[in-house]
Amino acid sequence: MDCIFCDIVKGRVPCHKIWENDEHLAFLSIFPNTKGFSVVITKEHFSSYAFGQEDQILTKLILATKKVALLLDESLEGVGRTGMFFEGYGIDHLHSKLFPMHGTGNNSDFKNIESKINKYFNSYEGYISSHDCDQADDKELNSLANKIRKTKLK
């Protein structure tokens, strides 16, 4: 199996390591869309869909990611918070991504910061966004909520 993250763990491919423990490794992305954009990976290969993992594996990854996020908050000027997300479509190896939120201050106190983007996604476009869009219709939301509540997990 060819896996760039496995090669990084084995030292076959270099990385800009920022943190590690026995089970996880964190490094700066070589394709950052903001300063400090980082990836936290499991050293053991697991499939990239985070919510398909055993609870213990995912929990450990989240706790490792928290440590790295707090390092980013402390080390990057003007970063009060760091966002975390699981996407899993770039590389099929379990990982989280960390997005330092530059311009949010030097502490994690809440500040209301709203996006000016107003885009609704009908399909995945290769990235995740957390901005709000137009208010949805209550009848449509109620129908969707009912459908989700009635769904049984396999």
Predicted regions and their residues:
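HIT superfamily nucleotide-processing domains
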Residues: 1-154
